[in-house]
Amino acid sequence: MPIYFLVLKGTGHVQALAFPKSVSDCLGRVTDTEPMLQQSIEACDRVSTETQQLLDILKQQQDDSVLEIQDTLTIAAQGLGPQQRLCAALALLHEREPSIVQQYHDVVGSLSLPEMLKTSHVARSITFHSLLHYERLCTRLHYCHLQQSVHKQKPVRMPGKLRGRWWCQESEPQQVRFGQNVRKHVVSIGGVYAQERCMTTWSTYSVDICLINLSLTRDRPASVGGLQLQVYRISASHAEPSGKRVGHIRHRAGTRQQLQEELCTKKEKLAEMTVLTQEKLSEVIKLREITMASKAESVKLACLQKLVSPQTVSRVLSFSGISYNRLILFYVRQFIFGLAWSLSCQLPLAERHSLSNLVCRYYSDYLDQPSSEVSTKTLLTLALGMQAMLTTRTTYSLISWRLRTSIQTVSTGSVRWILCLSALPTQRLLAQILRNVPWSQRRTQFQIRPISMHHRPYGYQATVQHPPPQSSYEEDGRRPPTQPAHTSLLTYVCSINSEYWQLNDPENCELRSFFFLQSIESMSTPSSH
């Protein structure tokens, strides 16, 4: 399998960026406009406008992989022309963050990669990391045979382990150079054993070379803007060993086929591990999104609890002079209608059991107030209406049993739950329940007796502010309600179009504060009856 790689020189060491053949061909077709004379330090440090735009895009990202791409682009920016820097950046972006390329298509859209790199996830996964071991191995072989001395006579093997050095009988070395007209040069090495040990950040491996004829073909010799673009085709073939060293050579050295099979196996394993890593990364991203959504919901609930906190309620009591019993009566009535919405939702069974416990505690506190004039029959009517909205028979029986128990044995529960949960915007919640229920079936389906929300001893009158216009009833085919102040709140909400409550969103802080103040004002205003 031919190996194609891009070598950057000028930094004291070789920085290799491994690309598939399609990317190397794409880089080779790009013509750069920077002349060869601009090989100064200022020219190497200068970054083109297109590459700077890509670097600015990468700085805005918070992912670790994108930051690693930014460091790689900083190294690759030295000595490259603007078009070649942009191609290298585009290749890395396609490999690590393809969504960025799609998002900023106006910046990098003119220099697009071939379709093979876009569609094949295997080609994208082995572009940078998976082929790094394979590419560095071939790079070591290349520089071991090209940049060191090669002699006409047969070299001999020196004792000991030699790392990256070839010892020869003659003192006069012969350098192997490639001119622009030279297309092929064959280096034949016979009777020589060397061990090359390559240390990488991931693993350590050794390569034994013995009696191998290496053919190095330079396809495109070019040096543009300080960039040494070398595309080599590396092939190997075994020579006939000498008689005395046959057993030793076969014992210490591997064949070309074994080396290729080992490298292909490592490449396939690395590609599979890369695909698994990408799948795990997608799962982590999904878990991160769920966590952020739960945090946002917690913040929303915290804002709502500030409005109905015990401190806020005590402050309202101290400044308005409302009696505690009247405030409890108001909160209990608001909670009854809010609970009807909660039980009608598709909640899990465990949450419905916890809601049934709260129902018992609320009714206990409600009956514990000596000034309330609500009879047990009224409470049973409301309880039957709420039970009719349940979807599971088990929860229906459980709540029915607990309601009967709580009504027979009155206990003192905590009023704090009433203050924390009862100030919900119940009008909109009930409108969402009855959105898909026809007007003719709303009263017969729930079988809730209209209960007057007007109590003379307390002067409390619960009405809905700003009723919808007449046109909303005509479009829905319903009649407007008569005397909304003397009918029950549930009956009045049933007659209101749900689009009105969607337009007046109770999640708005101003509307919620207005609703809360209007409710307090309605309790403090004496009735005319």
From Swiss-Prot:
Taxonomic superkingdom: Eukaryota
Region described as Disordered: 460-484
Keywords tagged on the record: Stress response
Protein name: Heat shock protein 60
